[in-house]
Amino acid sequence: MKKAVLAVLIAAFVTAVIYAVPINGETEIYNKVVRLHVIANSDSEEDQALKLAVRDAILEKVSSATENCSSREEAEDVISSMLPEIVKQAEKTLRDNGSEYHVSALIGKENYPTREYGDIRLPAGNYSSLRVMIGKAEGKNWWCVLFPPLCTGTAKPDDTLVAAGFTPGEVRILTDSESPEYTLKFRILEIFGSLFS
């Protein structure tokens, strides 16, 4: 019985390792996207509303500044240079809504779960990310894609992705709703990962 349990555990581990390696262009997807992660002070209704107001202000400010960027690196440089402005805009938005919370922001690598944004499905992985933390940052998250601008609804997703340098194959990976192969693989990783978190 112990050998059978050990064999199952080893098989599960090997499967997880195999599926943890990005395949079929996923690494290139990770390298072409800047995500946005806004974290509320708490889960209270007021703090969640403030999070959404900050989100809207950041999307407006950053989207206009990065609209002519043609790569993740270029967008990341623009966003990095704007960090003090982003914090200032977020805090102004909070003050305008009667809050005195402090805001911090940084750009770096961050792990994201699989997420769907309309017709786009981004695989779980380690992405470049603008992380904005409001107050104690103990509330619910809000995640989206800052570059290419998939959160603003300003363009068709396929056109936006192509303009940002995605290949037709990468666009298919992101937009193909008929690809259970990807869904199954990522779901297996999510389930396996949740067992150890």
Short names for language-model regions:
Residues 72-113:
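Amphipathic, coiled-coil-like alpha-helical scaffolding segments used for oligomerization/assembly
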Residues 18-31:
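Aromatic-capped interface at the extracytoplasmic side
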Residues 33-39, 102-106, 129-133, 143-145:
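Soluble periplasmic/extracytoplasmic beta-strand elements of cell-envelope proteins
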Residues 31, 35-68:
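Short extracytoplasmic
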Residues 173-197:
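Bioactive mature segments of secreted peptide hormones/signaling peptides processed from precursors
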Residues 119-182:
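Soluble extracytoplasmic domains of inner/organellar membrane proteins
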Residues 4-20:
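Hydrophobic membrane-insertion alpha-helices, especially the h-region
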Residues 57-69, 85-97, 153, 191:
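Structured segments of extracytoplasmic/periplasmic soluble domains
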